[in-house]
Regions:
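Positively charged n-region of N-terminal signal peptides that target proteins for export
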Residues: 1-4
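Bacterial N-terminal signal peptides
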Residues: 7-17
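Proteolytic maturation boundary segments
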Residues: 17-49, 231-272, 314, 413-534, ...
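Histidine-acidic residue clusters that define the catalytic metal-binding segment
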Residues: 22-39, 103, 138, 164, ...
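M16 family metallopeptidases and their MPP-like homologs
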Residues: 51, 55-82, 97-143, 173-199, ...
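Short, polar/flexible loop-turn hinges at active-site or ligand-entry regions and domain interfaces
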Residues: 89-96, 144-152, 366-370, 611-619
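Short, conserved secondary-structure transition motifs
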Residues: 162-168, 258-271, 379-388, 595, ...
Length: 922
């Protein structure tokens, strides 16, 4: 029998001071927990959650429906997700024909918006300027009960969702995850994936979807959440005006009552597909998120799999048997699974890794955990409690999971419950849930290594991941909202505490400290601090030398220093819930850190120590070689990677920093790399010269400057970023094929060198024109190739790789093999029309509103602001650029925008790359 977690009452009295309930006619105030007030609309039972937070002029509006794939049966699997897609196709008062459908309405505001479907829920959200609250309330209310649900919309959207299904099937890990759930659950509907079975996706009728809509989309089965800059009384009136027009559902919402019978023996699944490296996963059934044991299960999972001091890292990853063990534990309404995923390193055996995972689980059950392990896991929970309050969008996203689990107060309650977990609790839940009889073990076994070499010219006649997660209306990994990432989406100063339109640059405290260009931006967020930094030690800095050396050097930074080993460093970070990461990009070493205010000295000291005096030991060097080789081999399983990789080599000449090294060549370079080369690269390229550091959040500027000066004192050295001559488009179009048998979706890249850096005078004009072609659902590509023709889940166009050197212009898309030629032809048809006829004044005006209107959204978190400020200075602008950007976009003339298309692009000379199971290869 399920036990309910009851912790809110223990601390409710102290939390009430944070809440500010208001009395509005027509509502019942239910309770206040933490900073959140819960109301019920009396007329129809709609639940409303409000959390005012005025540090930035943005808000997030979200509607969560308590219907997910757990409410589906055989024959209708995937219906919840397909219905989610159709929720964007028009409602009574919001249609494409009227020029105000969801995409047209929201993209004009610059909103971030999407929808997700998962096991227990479907949710729709908008993150936008607070002045647009009335707009989104009216739109969301309209589609709650006035959806058009037309057959002419279902047909093309079915093939869109089918391509989304096919894309997921391309991933061995996602396929294994799906098979494990199908084996672990035989009765409960968690058995089937949220995306559904292919035949159900293809055959579900519009009548069945209408029945689903009329059963579950009612106010009494929904929660409206508003987080951010708004006045509660006004917001409640807006919600009542729009959502209050609908009655309570005419029938009770059907209850999903199926319970999974007790499992009486271990289960196994094996997935065999083309791929590079194997995977081992071990899953056990665990209780629902509302169960009293769940907080202990979360901490147990962290002790097993989270960080360098986790049990699985030490037993598997640290012994070169995996490229990185991960744990998977969702926040679900019903009992689900805890999984340990171990992608195998080259040469590792499934049997050996599985045996180690099981042995570590048994050791945990037999011997328990130490107090130090528990305190480190609890510290992460405490820090995450602060981090999840960094921006309205993150708060709403976290809250959504607890709403769907059945108790939104778990947003606070699980954090409180974690404080009370003991080492005895950890051992008890391990013994209770990590049993052999409740386990399902899965292997992914690659049947062939797949093609790993360079792309081959196409034959004549052919024209031009978390494993388990929700399914989205639009791919969250694909930028639809802006083109030219980083600075392109710079917004008003999130967290500055100023009013909309306030200048950003005066809030940036810029100074040179110990040779480092240091920028600090204090915001209104409490406790949270994000650090972003860079120095010229990226992959391009290898020059004509071994291309793996910069990457291997970056990988060794967090593997111990001359003063302490990696486990001691990890223990210090984990004890306060902080994190530091290093990554060698194309041009620079990227440094990211997140911490609480009190831990700034600790984190800065560790960053300085890791940059200045890494151990660079032979033992860790050998491990890094194997890890890097394993990562490259695993990337060869991705059609997206293979297409982008081949495209990069096709458009950039030898010696250009942006030209990728062929995978086979990089694997050979890793094997031949020498530790002495790493030491020489570190000595030559690491130093404060050209290093930039941005710190944003709850920061004392003077104290920060003093601490940076102390920990980096007397550090010398460093290099400038590698520069290159401009690339030139090829003469004559070419098509390159990368054959990857067994893939159900083909990735396509079409484009050319742009010849532009972000700082060039024509860049913004071409960027705006490109956004009209390929950004968002109002972009021509998505509006036609996806929405009208239903040929793809995702297609877009953008500029990129242009921070320090000239970059490229590209269109990316995915198509089913059977629709490949038709999809490419449709894409090229839109490209030709855009190039020949140009863009209209109306399109230019709307896209300017999108870019400028979205200015105040992306910087509403410390991370977003830090990323954007660092990108600005790396591109040669001062912080003032963030204030100047809207005016520069607004000043672009129609003539400039259209002239940029013709000046820089040559569709007749573009490269097309196709990667996947190609018709010619079948």
């Amino acid at each position: 029998m399920k036990r309910t977690l009851v912790v809110a009452g223990l601390w409710l009295a102290s939390a009430l001071a944070l809440a500010a309930p208001v009395a509005v006619k027509g509502y019942n105030h239910v309770k206040s927990v933490g900073a959140i007030d819960e109301y019920t609309l009396q007329s129809n039972g709609l639940q409303v959650l409000l959390m005012p937070e005025h540090s930035t002029p943005t808000l997030t509006f979200m509607v969560t429906y308590r219907v997910g794939s757990r409410n589906e049966v055989t024959g209708t699997t995937g219906a919840t997700h397909l219905l989610e897609h159709l929720m964007f196709k028009g409602s009574k008062n919001h249609t494409r024909e009227k020029g105000n459908n969801v995409d047209q309405l929201l993209e004009r505001t610059g909103a971030k918006y999407n929808a997700t479907t998962f096991l227990d829920r479907t949710n729709y959200y908008e993150n936008l300027g607070s002045e647009h609250l009335a707009t989104v309330v009216g739109m969301e209310a309209d589609r709650m009960r006035n959806l058009l649900l037309r057959e002419e919309d279902r047909k093309p959207e079915m093939t869109v969702v089918r391509n989304e299904f096919e894309r997921g099937e391309n991933s061995p890990i996602q396929a294994l995850y799906k098979e494990i759930y199908q084996s672990a659950f035989v009765a409960h509907p968690y058995h089937h994936s949220t995306i559904g079975h292919r035949s159900d996706i293809e055959k579900v009728s519009i009548a069945k979807l209408r029945e689903f809509y009329d059963t579950f989309y009612w106010p009494n089965n929904a929660t409206v959440t508003i987080i951010g800059d708004f006045e509660p009384a006004q917001a409640l009136e807006l919600v009542k005006k729009s959502f209050g027009a609908y009655p309570h559902s005419p029938k009770p919402i059907p209850e999903m009552y199926t319970e999974e019978p007790e499992q009486t023996g271990a289960r196994r699944v094996i997935v065999k597909r083309p791929g590079q490296l194997g995977v081992v996963a071990v899953a056990h059934k665990v209780p629902a998120a509302t169960h009293a044991d769940f907080a202990a299960v979360q901490l147990m999972s962290a002790i097993l799999t989270d960080g360098k001091n986790s049990r699985m890292y030490k037993a598997i990853t640290n012994k070169n048997l995996s490229t990185g063990v991960e744990g998977d534990l969702g926040i679900f309404h019903d009992p689900s699974l805890h999984m340990v995923f171990a992608p195998l390193a080259p040469g590792a055996k499934h049997e050996e890794v599985e045996a180690i995972i099981l042995a570590e689980i048994e050791r945990l059950k037999k011997d328990g955990v130490t107090e130090a392990e528990l305190q480190a896991a609890a510290a992460k929970v405490a820090a995450d409690a602060a981090f999840k309050l960094d921006g309205s969008f993150g708060i709403a996203g976290n809250l959504n999971e607890y709403i769907s689990a059945g108790d939104w107060t778990l947003f606070y309650g699980l954090d409180e419950a974690a404080k009370k977990v003991t080492v005895a609790d950890i051992q008890r839940v391990a013994q209770t849930y990590l049993t052999e009889n409740s386990s399902t073990t899965g292997w992914f076994v690659p049947t062939q290594p797949g093609a790993g070499g360079a792309a081959k010219p196409a034959k004549a006649g052919h024209q031009a991941e978390r494993a388990g997660g929700p399914f989205y209306y639009r791919d969250p990994q694909h930028s639809h909202g802006s083109v030219g990432v980083d600075l392109a989406s710079a917004k008003e100063p999130g967290g500055s505490g100023g009013a909309a339109g306030a200048k950003m640059a005066p809030n940036v405290r810029r100074s040179t400290v110990a040779g480092i260009d240091l920028m600090a931006y204090p915001t209104g967020v409490k406790d949270v601090v994000t650090l972003r930094a860079s120095l010229p030690a990226g992959r391009a800095q290898a020059g004509a030398g071994n291309p793996s050396i910069p990457v291997l050097t970056s990988m060794l930074l967090d593997q111990g220093t001359k003063s302490q080993d990696k486990f001691a460093i990890a223990e210090k970070l984990e004890s306060v819930g902080a994190s530091i990461s290093f990554r060698a990009g194309t041009d620079v070493l990227d440094i990211t850190a997140r911490m609480l205010k009190k831990d700034i000295p600790l984190v800065l000291g560790l960053i300085a120590e890791q940059l200045r005096t890494p151990a660079l030991s032979a033992e860790e060097f050998a491990k890094a070689q194997k890890q890097l080789a394993g990562g490259i081999k695993r990337s060869l399983e991705s059609t997206d990677f293979r297409a982008s990789d081949a495209f990069g080599r096709a458009v950039y000449p030898q010696g250009h920093p942006n030209r990728p090294v062929a995978p086979d060549d990089m694997l050979a370079a890793i094997e031949s790399a020498k530790l002495d080369d790493v030491k020489a690269f570190h000595a030559d390229h690491y130093g404060p010269s050209n290093m930039k550091m941005v710190v944003v959040g709850d920061v004392d500027v003077a104290a920060l400057q003093a601490e940076v000066g102390r920990v980096f004192a007397d550090w010398k050295g460093g290099k400038a970023v590698a520069r290159a001559a401009q690339s030139a488009p090829a003469v004559g179009a070419t098509t390159q094929d990368v054959a990857m048998p067994g893939k159900t979706s083909v990735s396509v890249v079409l484009g050319q060198p742009s010849g532009l850096r972000y700082s060039d005078s024509d860049y913004q004009a071409l960027r705006l024109a490109t956004a009209i072609l390929g950004s968002g659902f109002t972009g021509r590509l998505m509006a036609n190739v996806r929405d009208k023709e239903g040929l793809t889940y995702g297609v877009g166009a953008g500029l990129g790789n242009d921070m320090f050197n000239d970059g490229d212009w590209r269109i990316t898309a995915t198509f089913a093999p059977a629709l490949l030629d038709k999809g490419i032809a449709s894409t090229q048809r839109q490209l030709t029309l855009w190039y020949d006829a140009g863009v209209t004044p109306a399109e230019i005006s709307a896209r300017k509103s999108n870019l400028i209107g979205g200015f105040k959204v992306d910087l509403a978190t410390t991370g977003g602001l830090a990323n954007t400020l660092l990108a600005a200075v790396n591109r040669g602008y001062g912080p003032a650029w963030l204030d100047e950007y809207p005016a520069k976009v607004q000043a672009l003339s129609d003539e400039q925008v259209n002239a940029a298309i013709k000046k820089y692009l040559k569709p007749q000379s573009m490269v097309v790359v196709r990667a996947g199971s190609l018709p010619a290869a079948q």
